């Protein structure tokens, strides 16, 4: 989740960059959720790809905010008591202008969604369902229970309704709308990287400021 703050700074610093932040379900929906929500709310022109394996795999299998209720791991040996967050619904409801979900075993569709997300002008979010073969092997679950939605929703309400489906797992692009970006409204055509001052100019301004105090 912390990568999202850095990604926003990179994009604002140099709007000519195409910026993609790769995060996990644990950090994006846990300790970094505030960064994710505000990047979506602002409509910063970046792409966030959230790899969702439903577990903290690097620390041997603890549950995350998106793990299903009843998930058993080192931190929840009796099963998690919490209902999981729905990343797609969260992103829709905080204002993300492009929201999609893909599955790592469906490479062709995954690639197509990645491309469309990166071409979208504004904040784009892609949740990638991917099993953790060591601590949360969900291949069978996803192979049997995922389906692709026919087309993106015509409205926010329709997108939210699709994202709320529980008996199956919808894949595809839920939402894709045009809206002014935070970067454009903030920068108004400027590029802070190419228009930055030289080191001597910066030092001169600092010295001038200090002298005036």
Region annotations inferred by a language model:
Residues 16, 64-117:
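Conserved thiamine diphosphate
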Residues 132-213:
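Flexible, low-complexity linker and terminal segments
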Residues 17-21, 45-49, 89, 97-100, ...:
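Structural motif
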Residues 27-30, 102-111, 154-156:
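Active-site glycine- and acidic-residue-rich loops that bind
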Residues 94-103, 121, 125-133, 139:
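Active-site rim beta-loop-alpha module in soluble metabolic enzymes
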Residues 31-35, 41, 58-63, 136-141, ...:
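Short acidic, glycine/serine/threonine-rich loops at helix termini
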Residues 1-57:
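Thiamine diphosphate
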